[in-house]
Amino acid sequence: EQIQAAGIGVATAGPAAIRETLSLYGVIAPNAERVREVSARFPGVLRSVDRKIGDAVKQGEALATIESNESLQTYTLTAPLGGVVTQRSANAGEQTGEKSLFTVADLSTVWVELSLFPRDLAKVRVGQTARIRSVDAGLSADGRVVYVAPFGSTATQTLVARVQLDNPDRRWAPGLYVNA
């Protein structure tokens, strides 16, 4: 009677598959293959800046208007892909020079940079599925290991295992810590 009240059950032991799991920690990062630095095609003066950090942009939308130093004609600097403006180094009236004026990141997929200790290196392979959980356990999703670093960090004595994660709702924000 006490066993039933405690919710304890009895079952017959038999053959089953054992799955080894590994607990890792990491951070969300933009998918570097979906990040673009945007510079002026021709040197000139920024006449207007149309976007700020955090703005969503579609491919081809205006980021700024520049007056060319050579032709004195204005041209529009456009977003090379749809995403979010993550950096801006442009203000109206400034010379463009050769610097990057904007960074645009498509966050529909993100990378999870997991810290992998050398003793665990043999347990992680490209192609494996990884369950990613937010630190507060509010979010959970499965991704695939797409890269395991062939070299480690002297500062942390770890290697990077990279998981690609679909992020259609933009709920996995770069910079946040996660568990895997």
Predicted regions and their residues:
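Hydrophobic core residues within well-ordered beta-strands of beta-rich domains
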Residues: 22, 139-141, 157, 178
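Short, acidic/hydrophobic/Gly-rich beta-strand patch recurrent on exposed beta strands
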Residues: 38-39, 65-68, 103-105, 162-164
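Short, solvent-exposed secondary-structure boundary/capping segments
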Residues: 35-37, 95, 151-162
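Low-complexity, intrinsically disordered
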Residues: 126-142, 170-171
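A structural micro-motif recognizing beta-strand termini
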Residues: 41, 80, 116-120, 163-169
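N-terminal beta-strand block that forms a small beta-sandwich/beta-barrel module immediately after a flexible targeting
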Residues: 1-40, 89, 142, 146
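Surface-exposed patches in structured soluble domains
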Residues: 27, 45-66, 78-115, 135, ...
